Design a protein with these regions (language model features):
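Sec-dependent signal peptide recognition
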Residues: 1-2
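C-terminal motif of bacterial Sec signal peptides marking the signal peptidase cleavage site
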Residues: 5-9
């Protein structure tokens, strides 16, 4: 009997209490990225202490101002962008292994390259950590260099 009590007290009740709300914030953030409707609304979701890992090789962490430029750069280069999530996964604190409300997602971006008109599809992985209800840390993980090279005008064009 004591064993069952100890075993049940060690189990979790599911996700961190902030996880579902944070997933909704991430979904809104991604929809804004694709629609290009309101870059400021995206930046309002970002904490002043942001540290973001861009997808480009050799790039270190960037802060909020650089992140705004990074987002607008993608928006200027692409049209009709949609992110289709394969999943939204709960993240854990790397030091404790305990669910912390952060969000991870594998998914696929689709869209059209503004300059060449080429349609594209890109598999990716993203992370978002939160502080005070805002995104404070995260990153984009995909082959940005290879992706952009695939969109370059061909010799025939």
């Amino acid at each position: 009997m004591i064993f069952l009590f100890v075993l049940s007290s060690c189990s979790t009740d599911g996700n961190h209490p902030d996880f579902e709300a944070n997933v909704e914030k991430v979904q809104t953030f991604l929809e804004l990225q694709g629609s290009e409707a309101d870059p400021q609304a995206q930046l309002d979701m970002i904490h002043e202490d942001l540290e973001w890992q861009p997808a480009f090789y050799g790039t270190g962490l960037i802060g909020k101002a650089e992140f705004g430029e990074y987002l607008i750069g993608w928006q200027d280069a692409m049209e009709d962008v949609v992110y289709t999530a394969t999943n939204y996964l709960p993240g854990v604190n790397p030091e404790t292994g305990i669910l912390d409300g952060s969000v991870r997602s594998y998914g696929t971006w689709t869209g059209v390259h503004s300059e060449t008109g080429k349609s594209w599809e890109l598999s990716s992985y993203h992370t978002w950590d939160f502080k005070d209800g805002q995104i404070v840390y995260g990153g984009d993980y995909f082959d940005a260099g290879g992706f952009l090279a695939s969109l370059a005008p061909s010799e025939e064009e």
